[in-house]
Amino acid sequence: MSAPAPPSAGAFPSPPGGFAPAPPPSTKRNAELILLAGATGIVTVSLFLVEASQEQSVTWDIAKYGLAYLALFAVAHLAVRRFAPFADPLLLPIAALLNGLGLVLIHRLDLADAQTAAYNSWPIPSPDTNQQILWTGLGMIIFIGILVVLSDYRTLAKYSYTLGLVGLVALAIPALLPGAYSETNGSKIWIRLPGLSVQPGEFAKILLIIFFASVLVAKRDLFTAAGRHFLGMEFPRARDLGPILVVWIVCIGVLVFEKDLGTSLLIFSTVLVMLYIATERVGWLIIGGALLSIGFFFAYQAFSHVRVRTQTWLHPFADYNNTGYQISQSLFGLATGGLAGTGLGSGRPSQVPFAKTDFIITTIGEELGLFGLAAVLLLFLVFVVRGLRTALAVRDSFGKLLAAGLSFTIAIQLFVVVGGVTKLIPLTGLTTPFMSYGGSSLLANYALLALLIKVSDAARAPAPVRKKDPVAPIADATTELLRKPEARPQE
């Protein structure tokens, strides 16, 4: 039997030297574009189902909206392809799908509000969907702007103290303003100007995450210093508790002066998780949990709004027509949805107050059922896991803590929201990331996404190859005549 013929040189060209060149690293940008197209398809079909159920007529305008949505995120995709080519290909499509589903649900609730107004001969309210679309466009501008301007995320560490100060000021401003310029539904969390309302706490949490990531890296020895051992765990020394006490006092101040339980809980929990990641000490978690319990007990004893929320959580049907109406309607809506849901546009989610903001999870559970709600939660889970995977893969400590802090912010916020609407924990007023109606939350989430993508790009990029010093050919090497040393005469 004859030996097999060697492969032709045309099929496998060999460069000089006989070694094949290394293939270029994969950026997965084409996969990202395909996933964006799939997300657009899901959003368009969802819009079709809502229109068919509510309006009983479907026009080609739905396809135009779908194409416009795809074009908007295609621009974001091009920015990622140009300025973060090695970033995780799942982060942007997941955010696009969540944002799109949120727009569909807000539009569905707008139609319900219009029907209710027409039935009662009230003025038709202006739709909130148009405003949310505008904020989505502004979010894309912020997202692309961060990708373009921030060439290296490690630059943020140089300005960490400035960013931390700005974050603290942003948290404090609503408490200092008169109620007419800052208060809504009892919470002073807004800055209201003519034609503009901003919730600075949404942006402050990102600035504070950057600050704490830098401090935990620079002062790591302070947080990991040898302390006391108890029950097999190492606890920090009393004099090293200053930083976490400062964070605790700031969060208590937010709770006291702004009546914002959600933001104070979110910031303290995120800092506590980052502290544990930086030190790997369970003692910090125990101390943080104790401080959290002390703060809640103090707030319950001192402030009526905390007592009301706690009593509503424990006994939602005791005052059904007043304080318990929100959570009761939320539970009824989730029960109505069952496993498969009533179908998009076929439920009655507008019965729940603040269905577009605090209770949009209830809308999902009612119309898409437990299966649909689980699918949405799975999207968030994948987003958080990919963010934590970025934290593990990135090479520098600041990037690790930054990515972990941003990822856990989304995870903790989602847990607090879902726990509130399902009566697992008291209601806090936080909104669902990327989905709930609101400009400040959406813009801040796209800024968070841009930072996470920049860290992911650095984590997945191939390590730079160090150039070797050129070696002169042997023919061009200089020749030196060495003379054998003469033997020294013995004395």
Locate each region found by the language model.
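Short, Lys/Arg-rich, polar N-terminal cytosolic tail immediately upstream
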Residues: 1-27
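Transmembrane alpha-helix boundary/anchor motif
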Residues: 74-78, 211, 297, 301-305, ...
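Membrane-interface helix-loop-helix junctions at transmembrane boundaries of multi-pass membrane enzymes
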Residues: 226-240, 387-408
